[in-house]
Amino acid sequence: MGRTQLQQTYDRLARLVPANRIIISTYREYVSIVKEQLPHISDDQILDEPIRKDTAPAVAWAAYRITKLDKKATILVTPSDQDIRNEDAFRANVHEALSFIEKKKEAIVAMGVRPTRPEPGYGYIQRGDNVDHDIYTVKSFTEKPNREFAQLFVDSGEFYWNTGMFFARAKQ
């Protein structure tokens, strides 16, 4: 049997950062599944969300907890359901984002993927001005547009699929 998406995400991140620095935030009911799939991680690497309230509150709560552990941490938020087919390109993009965050400590970097088709089930990031190599300001976010707008976004060349991955520094 193959690796689950959670295990693949963990493996991918463990090639980028020390494994003991990977923190998994999950709803309380799923903690046992996380422990079953990743038996080698310690309990303090799992943040069990007390209330299921979607992504933003979960990320805010996890960021608060991580900041308490290390005020100078760089935080990478990533869903565990990503389908990453080019690991080398992913690692290069992560390193580029981390380098940018090191220079611009107040920045938040959202990772997007160039769309290959109109997909109304995905969120979109509209690219703004170029600020560093392959890093742009964000002009707009659009959450799950209808197919017509998704097609316009793809045709414009200004939009990326929102991966849900982003980087930020812990509050200093």
Where are these regions (language model features)?
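Conserved core of the sugar-phosphate nucleotidyltransferase
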Residues: 85-171
